[in-house]
Structure formats: structure tokens, C-alpha cells
């Protein structure tokens, strides 16, 4: 690999990183201290979600992406998990929908109000139950609508269709893996699933059947993260001498890597990020303050080192803005959101290509890119179809082009209407999880779970109602529902006070008995 940028004439060889000032960053964010090797941050053009540290459960913040300055300490959060949140991911085709996974063995799907989180959200739209141990990884399908992939410490990969009816869903596909998964990545069209396991081997699977297509042998490269980069695979890990490495693979032949390159002797995990439009690969280390970037090609030497962004503040995790949210007039080609735990800071970092004409759309920097519309439904993918992403131009005013025939929307797809919302809210009190899930026999709730999987912390403002006013009859039912929720909350508060009083009396009785024993 060439380490001299002058040896490779690339229009990206002068890319530089521009960090936002503290006034334009997110200050005062209580970033999670979890040791799990995840990004802990997800971004779309509307919101940024950051996993936070909290007691008594798991939560994450959802802030407007244009928020500036300090975040209030009592900022409302999304806090429906009963254990620590391990990862969050925005739906690529719905900027108001986000998925989260947790140590409580569940995956939850949340609806975020268009005006932002004004009240604490404690009830999810969907709860996905199927894993018997903590869920560490989630990924949305890149081209199919409402299709989610999750991986847990039970050696299982599950595929979910979140467009199905019901508050609690079962997986539509369940794959068994030979080892614990450390990283998963779907190909650009979602046809293949690459994974990195605890035995440090790479595997390529067919996600519908779970059949292993390729498996790497015992090489000197011990992979910890894997990423699909066009028609190639990129993995990061360590060598047998504990030197951090990056490797490039042919997904159709994992017997030997195409390229192995040692980087340094640091111990932090390297997160790979790939931009398919510019063919640039970014390597950011957990606990590092630097980000290396390269240009990836399909011919030798495969990787061309460009340059490096350096900072004195180490990052714990990173989020990435989709291409449709970049500042194209400022020649911004990539944007990170660095989680700096020492400063309780989320710092935007823009990768910029210097150009003489600023404020003009540069067509050579922004080819057609993946848009915000799905190429097919979840059922179409499950039936065996494969489609690439629908492309859009980043030029202001351009629209997404659809080369596939239009289909009439199926019933039940899209966001729930007012009637569905009302029925879901009225049925919430008596909602129970199905008892006929044959594939959940190994699932056991931990000590942090509430008995019966009930939701005692429900509040009348846990979900935002639709902006369109419902008909009068539905409005009356909704008012009755909220009134009942108020009564339930008051009774719950009274019960909590009684329990506190009982505990106090028990302690007083115990102290009196101890005094009497000491006296006699």
C-alpha cells in the first residue's frame, strides 16, 4: 500500500477534517460508559440519537440535528428499556422511526414526533422478542422497507418485519451462528450478510436461509469488525503480534485476504466507515483522537492512504450523517459525530474537499447516491427478490428516481392512522405477549424485567397523538383513555407512598428491637 499521497493522483488527496466549535456542538450530553464496542450514536437529516448513561434502565437522547450549545440536564429521553441500551439505528426510509437494542433481550421500534421529543417516551410502537440473551447489534436492511436484522449473545441472528400488525412481533427468519457475533454488515442490495465472530473468522451468509457461503481460514489477521465496501469486504482487527490491522477481502473467496496492513499498536477497536460514492474508507479507533482515510480500489494495491485527522480528544463512539444530509454547497463529502465522553460533548466533524468555487454544486463530488425511498417491501425481499437502492441526486431540487415498476401500497403499510393509533392505545392495558412462540422456549427474563412484561411506568404523554384531530367519537374515547391513565398514575403514586411507609415502619421496628436487646 502506498503511504505517500503524492503517489496516487486522487481528487480527494487534500480532504481535511473541520471540527465544529463548542458553540455548534452538543454540550452536556451524559454519554454512556458501556464497554460494548458499538457506535452509540445514529444520525439522520432531522435528529441525532445518543445512548446516555442512566440508572434504573436504559435510555437515549433524541435531539434536533440543528441543536446548538448545551443540552439541558432534564432533557426528555426515550427510556422504555429496563436495562442498558447497547445500540440505536435510524430507519433509512423513515426519519421519524428509530430502533434500539438492549441488555433486556429486546429490540424496540420507536416513533419520534416530528417536532422532537417534548415528553419522556416510555412506550415503544413495537417490541421485538425472540432473543434469550442481550442484543448487541442491529442493522436496517439497505433496500427493503421495515426490515431489521438483530444479533445477540445467544448465537442467533434474527430478521424482523416491523410492518406486521401487533405491538409484539416474532422474527420472520432465525439464523444460528457457530460463534458469538462481533460485527455484521449487509451488502449494498441486502443479498448477503457478512459477519465477524468471536473466533476471529469472517463468514458470508445468505440471510434468508442462514447458509454459510464463505468462511475465512486461520490467518494472522484476527478480525473484530467487518464492513461491505462495494464488491469487497473490509475488516479491522489485530495481528498475531497485537498490532492493529486493516484487511481487504474478496467476498467470494475468503481463503486469503487481498491485502493486510498493520497500522499501530493501540488497543482500541477500529471502526470502518465506507462511502460508496467517493470510494473513501475511514478508520476511526475507539479511544483514539485520530481518523485515517483512504481511497479503496478494486485493483492492487487496493488501498491508497490519503491523510489523517488528528485531535487531542479521544472518541468513544461515532455517528455518521447520511449523504442526503450533507452540506453540498460547502463541498462536504462526509460528516462524523464524535462522542467525547471526557467533555460530555458530541462534536460534528466535517470532511471537506477544498475547491476554489464555494457555494456551487460540484457534480464530480456528488454522483447519484442512495435515497430515502425503499426499493421493495419486506415481503418482496422475503420471497427472494433482490434490488439495489433507489438513487437520488444531491443537487438541490432533484428527486429520487425509481427504475422499478410502481406497486400499490399494501394495507397496513406506512405509518399508523388515527384509528390504528386509538385501537393500540385502548388495547394497551390488556396487551399480553403471545404464548405460542415456539422459538422462544429458551428465553428467560432477567432480574431487571417487570413481571409479566407489563409496563407500570406508562404515562398519558408517552406517545404523541397524531396532528390531525380524530372524529368526535374517537376524541371522546381518547379523552376517556387519558383520564383512566391519570387515575392509574395517581393510584400508582399512592401505592409507592404506601410501600415507602411500610419500609420505614419495618426499619423503625427493627431499630426498636435492637435497642431492647441492647438494654437487656
Regions picked out by a protein language model, each given a short descriptive name:
Residues 97-110:
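Classical protein tyrosine phosphatase
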Residues 48, 97-98, 147-148, 193, ...:
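Acidic/hydrophobic-patterned starts of short beta strands in beta-sheet-rich repeat architectures
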Residues 1-71, 217, 306, 325-482, ...:
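Acidic and/or Ser/Thr-rich intrinsically disordered tails and linkers
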Residues 113, 117, 158-160:
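Acidic/polar low-complexity surface segments
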Residues 127-302, 306-325:
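WD40 beta-propeller repeat blades
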Residues 69-98, 123-126, 133:
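Blade-loop segments of beta-propeller domains
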Residues 116-121, 166-169:
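A short alpha->loop->secondary-structure connector
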Residues 57-62, 109, 242-247, 288-295, ...:
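Structural motif
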Amino acid at each position: 500500500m502506498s503511504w505517500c499521497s503524492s503517489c496516487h493522483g486522487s481528487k480527494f488527496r487534500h480532504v481535511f477534517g473541520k471540527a465544529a466549535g463548542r458553540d455548534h456542538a452538543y454540550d452536556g450530553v451524559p454519554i454512556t460508559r458501556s464497554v460494548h464496542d458499538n457506535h452509540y450514536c445514529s444520525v439522520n437529516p432531522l435528529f441525532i440519537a445518543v445512548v446516555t448513561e442512566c440508572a434504573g434502565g436504559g435510555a437515549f437522547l433524541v435531539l434536533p440535528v440543528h441543536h446548538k450549545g448545551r443540552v439541558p440536564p432534564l432533557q426528555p429521553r426515550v427510556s422504555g428499556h429496563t436495562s442498558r441500551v447497547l445500540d440505536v439505528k435510524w430507519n433509512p426510509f423513515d426519519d421519524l422511526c428509530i430502533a434500539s437494542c438492549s441488555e433486556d433481550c429486546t429490540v424496540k421500534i420507536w416513533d419520534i414526533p416530528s417536532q422532537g421529543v417534548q415528553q419522556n417516551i416510555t412506550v415503544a410502537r413495537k417490541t421485538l422478542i425472540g432473543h434469550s440473551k442481550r442484543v448487541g447489534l442491529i442493522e436496517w436492511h439497505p433496500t427493503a422497507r421495515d426490515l431489521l436484522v438483530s444479533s445477540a449473545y445467544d448465537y442467533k441472528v434474527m430478521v424482523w418485519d416491523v410492518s406486521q400488525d401487533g405491538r409484539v412481533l416474532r422474527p420472520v427468519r432465525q439464523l444460528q451462528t457457530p460463534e458469538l457475533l462481533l460485527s455484521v454488515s449487509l451488502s449494498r442490495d441486502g443479498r448477503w450478510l457478512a459477519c465477524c465472530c468471536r473466533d476471529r473468522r469472517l463468514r458470508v451468509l445468505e440471510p434468508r436461509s442462514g447458509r454459510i457461503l464463505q468462511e475465512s481460514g486461520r490467518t494472522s489477521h484476527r478480525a473484530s469488525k467487518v464492513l461491505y465496501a462495494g464488491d469487497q469486504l473490509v475488516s479491522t482487527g489485530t495481528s498475531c503480534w497485537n498490532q492493529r490491522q486493516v484487511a481487504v477481502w474478496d467476498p467470494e473467496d475468503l481463503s486469503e485476504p487481498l491485502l493486510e496492513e498493520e497500522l499501530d499498536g493501540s488497543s482500541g477497536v477500529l471502526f470502518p466507515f465506507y462511502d460508496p460514492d467517493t470510494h473513501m474508507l475511514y478508520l476511526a479507533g475507539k479511544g483514539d483522537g485520530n481518523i485515517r482515510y483512504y481511497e479503496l480500489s478494486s485493483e492492487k494495491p487496493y488501498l491508497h492512504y490519503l491523510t489523517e485527522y488528528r485531535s487531542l480528544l479521544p472518541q468513544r463512539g461515532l455517528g455518521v450523517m447520511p449523504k442526503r444530509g450533507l452540506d453540498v454547497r460547502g463541498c462536504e463529502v462526509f460528516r462524523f459525530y464524535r462522542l467525547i465522553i471526557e467533555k460530555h460533548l458530541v462534536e460534528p466533524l466535517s470532511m471537506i474537499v477544498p475547491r476554489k468555487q464555494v457555494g456551487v454544486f460540484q457534480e464530480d463530488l456528488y454522483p447519484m447516491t442512495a435515497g430515502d425511498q425503499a426499493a421493495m417491501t419486506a415481503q418482496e425481499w422475503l420471497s427472494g427478490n433482490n434490488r439495489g437502492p433507489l438513487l437520488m441526486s444531491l443537487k438541490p431540487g432533484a428527486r429520487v428516481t425509481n427504475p422499478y415498476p410502481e406497486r400499490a401500497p399494501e394495507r397496513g403499510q406506512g405509518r399508523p392512522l388515527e384509528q390504528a393509533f386509538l385501537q393500540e392505545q385502548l388495547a394497551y392495558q390488556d396487551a399480553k405477549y403471545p404464548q405460542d412462540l415456539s422459538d422462544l422456549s429458551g428465553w428467560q427474563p432477567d432480574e431487571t424485567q417487570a413481571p409479566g412484561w407489563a409496563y407500570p411506568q406508562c404515562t398519558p404523554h408517552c406517545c404523541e397523538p397524531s396532528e390531525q384531530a380524530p372524529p368526535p367519537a374517537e376524541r371522546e374515547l381518547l379523552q376517556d383513555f387519558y383520564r383512566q391513565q391519570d387515575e392509574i398514575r395517581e393510584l400508582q403514586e399512592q401505592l409507592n407512598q404506601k410501600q415507602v411507609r411500610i419500609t420505614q415502619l419495618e426499619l423503625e421496628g427493627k431499630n426498636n428491637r435492637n435497642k431492647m436487646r441492647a438494654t437487656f
